[in-house]
A protein has these predicted regions:
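Charged, amphipathic alpha-helical linkers/stalks
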Residues: 391, 403-463
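Short, hydrophobic/amphipathic alpha-helical patches that form generic packing surfaces
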Residues: 16-20, 67-81, 395-402, 438, ...
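Catalytic-core regions of glycoside hydrolase
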Residues: 81-85, 110, 136, 143, ...
Length: 560
């Protein structure tokens, strides 16, 4: 196929478009054939918008700004009709604008997961792809939970990795942000500062080093941690800072209780004072994770109620509140007036089975459709929590919602499947995702898996595998989906033949015990392939068991 790009000076966008096409077909460049014209016109409409116009061999992608042009390129690529040798673009129905202003994804750089271990060049390419699917910001955290002090090697490793990610995003025109756990201390926090742990009842995420800001000297100690974190990015520039209440965080002493509606907003006020000294233009976000999830009969403990009062009075500077939970969407923000723009925090990484991503891809499309439908009327975007590449499909699902809240997952993921795999297998892959989800949810909730669903998912995956072109067949997005369908069947078969009905059998199934597949050579090969994709190679199992596939002995061979 002969292609010519008229960049009009938009070289970053042109380079990414060319590279994306080269990855799919063999094109001859700057020759007579299809012409792709790139342009920016801010008069067309809202920021970050685009329009695709043209027919036959001349197409024009116009953005209202640099990001809008990237999104237009993404849509042209994702919606085009591709063959092995060429593609036919599809025009948009007028100007396309995002419904939600805040569209971030959170790269969790810890636990020796993919973001932690992947080389920078992989993260560059992935961030480009995340951008093309419609995101406009990347968040990271400098994980105090892992640190003894700010002089150890781990601190510099985390700092350098987060800085590299931020530079990637900024170079593309995206915004960047960080999260500060408002009262979390280092692992060496003096015992005299420790928080009252009573607020952790029925909550996870307490490493034992959270701090009570009301203890003499504790606020100064916390302030020194916040400033140290914030100082690491002054040359790059932070566009957002979010404070976090629980997991990690919290204090149950009388002066702080209820933490979410009392101690946390007051501590966040102090964080904000330090933020604006270094980043006067940064937007400030308050998270409400785990709010009111511990009940004192006959009513919740009043964390949302207390926070909303602060937002109406001494916290007028807050730009967004983040509202979400591990399970269904919290009710309070749905039933009360919106006092600040609300964003969500979809739990796409840790719902259900362990290790996270240890069997491969983790599609949960029906679950996320239900949660989105229950909350979309109050949302101005969100930030999926990501531990790696294995939940890529869910990032794309939420990106689709943030652009068009009324879209259904089948439409969003249908376009994803057609582009990433083939337009000939859309229905089959959607069914694979739904079958994987069915058993994922059954097992997560303590039920027996549906054996017929597991067999059907594997059969479909094997059939799809024979229909894909070499590029799609070997691409990591298909490999992790294919491996998930295969490994699920193997795990459920072992459970069915050896464990069903025994004590703790369903708990062991939920955790994917290593011994389930220890003697299955085919499974071991597939699991080791996952480890290579995730870069969990030659690591001690105990260091990264959260995201380490359940390979025999916790070791991975470097060569196939």
């Amino acid at each position: 196929m002969n292609i010519k790009i008229v960049s009009n000076g938009h070289t970053k966008q042109a380079d990414l478009l060319k590279r994306s096409i080269d990855e799919r077909i063999s094109a001859t460049w700057d020759a007579d054939g299809m012409t792709l014209i790139l342009d920016i016109n801010s008069d067309l409409g809202p920021i970050e918008s685009y329009i695709i116009e043209g027919e036959k061999n001349e197409w024009k992608i116009t953005g209202t700004d640099g990001l809008g042009l990237f999104y237009g390129i993404g849509k042209l690529l994702h919606s085009a009709k591709w063959t092995a040798e060429a593609f036919d673009p599809v025009a948009t129905d007028g100007l396309v604008s995002p419904a939600c202003s805040f569209r971030a994804t959170y790269y969790t750089v810890h636990f020796h997961n993919w973001y932690h271990e992947a080389p920078v060049e992989e993260l560059v390419r992935y961030t480009e792809e995340v951008l093309l699917y419609g995101y406009n910001a990347i968040f990271c955290i400098l994980p105090v939970i892992n640190l003894n002090d700010f002089e150890e090697e781990a601190f510099y490793m985390f700092r350098d990795k987060t800085r590299a990610i931020y530079k990637i995003a900024k170079d593309l025109g995206m915004k960047v942000g960080t999260i500060i756990n408002a009262n979390q201390g280092l692992k060496t926090t003096p015992d005299k500062f420790l928080a009252d742990p009573s607020c952790y009842k029925d909550r996870t995420g307490n490493n034992g080093k959270n701090i009570c800001p009301e203890i003499d000297g504790a606020l100064d100690y916390l302030r020194s941690l916040w400033v140290k974190i914030l100082e690491q990015y002054t040359d790059i520039g932070l566009d957002y800072v979010m404070t976090w209440p629980y997991d990690e965080g919290g204090c149950g002493c009388p002066k702080c209780y209820p933490w979410g509606g009392n101690g946390f907003p007051r501590a966040s006020n102090e964080v904000h004072k330090e933020v604006i000294k270094l980043y006067p233009d940064a937007k400030f976000i308050l998270a409400t994770w785990y709010f009111d999830e511990v009940y004192v009969e006959p009513r919740p403990i009043g964390e949302y109620e207390g926070l909303y009062e602060h937002l109406r009075t001494d916290m007028s500077y807050v730009d967004y509140i983040m509202v979400d939970s591990h399970n269904m969407y919290p009710r309070y923000p749905l039933e009360h007036d919106i006092v600040k723009p609300i964003i969500n925090f979809p739990e796409i990484s840790m719902y259900g089975l362990k290790s996270w991503g240890g069997r491969g891809a983790m599609p949960l499309p029906k679950r996320f459709q239900r949660i989105w439908d229950s909350s979309k009327r109050v949302l101005d975007g969100g930030m999926p929590y990501s531990e790696g590449m294995y939940e890529d499909v869910s990032k794309v699902q939420f990106a689709g919602y943030y652009w068009d809240p009324d879209k259904n997952y089948r439409e969003i993921l249908g376009e994803y499947i057609a582009y990433e795999f083939s337009d000939k297998v859309v229905d089959e892959v959607l069914e694979i995702m739904e079958l994987i989800e069915k058993n994922h949810v059954l097992v997560r909730e303590g039920n027996e898996p549906d054996w017929d669903a597991a067999l059907r998912a594997e059969k479909l995956a094997e059939e799809v595998d024979t229909k894909l072109c070499p590029r799609a067949k070997t691409a990591w997005r298909w490999r992790i989906m294919y491996i998930r369908a295969r490994i699920d069947r193997m795990v459920y078969e072992y459970h069915r033949e050896n464990c069903q009905g025994k004590e703790n059998a369903l708990s062991d199934l939920w955790q994917t015990k290593e011994e389930y597949l220890a003697d299955n050579d085919e499974a071991q090969e597939l699991l080791q392939e996952l480890c290579r994709l995730y870069h969990t190679i030659d690591k001690e199992y105990k260091k990264n068991h959260w995201t380490f596939p359940p390979v025999k002995g916790g070791k991975v061979l470097k060569n196939r």
